[in-house]
Curated annotation (Swiss-Prot):
Protein name listed in UniProt: GTPase Obg
CDD domains documented for this protein: Obg
Organism (species): Campylobacter jejuni subsp. jejuni serotype O:23/36 (strain 81-176)
Primary localization: cytoplasm
Subcellular location: Cytoplasm
Family: Belongs to the TRAFAC class OBG-HflX-like GTPase superfamily. OBG GTPase family.
Lineage: Bacteria, Pseudomonadati, Campylobacterota, Epsilonproteobacteria, Campylobacterales
Length: 356
């Protein structure tokens, strides 16, 4: 089951209370204080793990708490620290304050560990309060309460390439033939109800991650269809591949315009992201000469529109996932784009290090 949003209360452990205790030995009727300190409460720690792909482990849980610290004991024995609670989450998980919507943590890298809530400090035992005017203190500190916070965990998939298109345009078929992903494929809209990630091996040394996002429809940015729930997953893809279907009644140019508008309404940053265009189902030209001519005009109209708007797209390619034509070229084109983006990011990070 794919779960990408949960609301939950997280609480670190309370500190254990300090002990009130006195030495009890033969021939020492009024032994001094020997109360130990309480143990600190356990912490809440988030751990990012790329073997985890969903937030399903948090489904149905209203609260998770770290262990409380144990109380102090006599003979100056300190209480045991409460066990930390480590929460394993997938890459791309954000921890958001449920009241203010403030992003508290952003977990994006394998192995990333973040202390979220610190456990309460254990109280001091009565040994600490002995002084010249009070040799037998009969009080100790209570432990400090742990922290508690109501949060929302949101998963935004991280991928190199995100597939953007209307329902049933061939996105799932494409990712099934170029990667290790096995999405459900059928001839009806909204076959893909959850995002899918696939690893695309281009050659022995190069690969990238592709995300199949459920189909976008007009009005998605306002919540129509599967709407906002899945548009957010495109946010963390480095490169967008628009998948357009020549078999739809809507012309290719109009498909592209509508999809771009939905992205623009959702996020200006996403709208400005670099992208390519893939015309799917190129084998449909076999349906007849007249149909093939219509598709050619359709593609030409799209191409002219892109030139009119000085479009920054990197490439336009025709592909048939069923006949496996154009797939090799597509993979290499995408790889070149990803390499360029990775190098640009690396150079930017290096520049930042030098400036710092």
């Amino acid at each position: 089951m794919f779960i990408d949003s949960v609301k939950i209360t997280l609480a670190s452990g309370d500190g254990g209370k300090g002990a009130v205790s006195f030495r009890r030995e033969k021939h020492v009727p009024l032994g001094g204080p020997d109360g130990g300190d309480g143990g600190n409460g356990g912490d809440i720690i988030f751990v990012c793990d790329n073997n985890t792909h969903t937030l399903v482990n948090f489904k149905g849980k209203r609260e998770l708490r770290a262990q409380n610290g144990a109380g102090g004991m006599g003979r100056n024995k300190n209480g045991k620290k409460g066990e930390n609670l480590e929460l394993i989450v997938p890459e791309g998980t954000q921890v958001i304050d449920a009241q203010t919507n403030e992003i508290l943590l952003d977990l994006t890298e394998e192995g990333q560990r973040e202390l979220f809530l610190k456990g309460g400090k254990g109280g001091l035992g009565n040994t600490h309060f002995k002084h010249a005017t009070n040799q037998r203190p009969d009080y100790a500190q209570p432990g400090i309460k742990g922290e508690s916070r109501l949060v929302r965990l949101e998963l935004k998939l991280i991928a190199d390439v995100g597939l953007v298109g209307f329902p049933n345009v061939g996105k799932s078929t494409l990712i099934s033939v170029v990667s290790n992903a096995k999405p459900e494929i059928a001839n009806y809209e909204f076959t893909t109800l959850t995002p899918k990630l696939g690893l695309v091996d281009v050659n022995e040394y190069n690969s990238f991650v592709m995300a199949d996002i459920p189909g976008i429809i007009e009005g998605a940015s306002g919540g129509k269809g599967l709407g906002l729930a899945f548009l957010k997953h495109i946010e963390r893809t480095s490169f967008l591949l628009f998948v357009l279907d020549p078999m739809r009644q809507m012309p290719l140019k109009e498909q592209f315009i509508v999809l771009r508008k939905e992205l623009e309404k959702f996020s200006n940053e996403l709208f400005g992201r670099k992208f390519g265009i893939m015309i799917s189902k190129s084998d449909s030209v076999r349906l007849g000469e007249e149909f093939a001519e219509q598709i050619a005009l359709n593609i030409n109209e799209l191409d002219n529109y892109l030139k009119e708007i000085n479009n920054p797209q990197s490439f336009l390619i025709k592909v048939s996932s069923l006949e496996k034509t154009g797939l090799k070229e597509l993979k290499f084109m995408l790889l070149e784009e990803i390499k360029t983006l990775r190098n640009n990011k690396k150079n930017f990070n290096n520049l930042g290090s030098v400036l710092y």
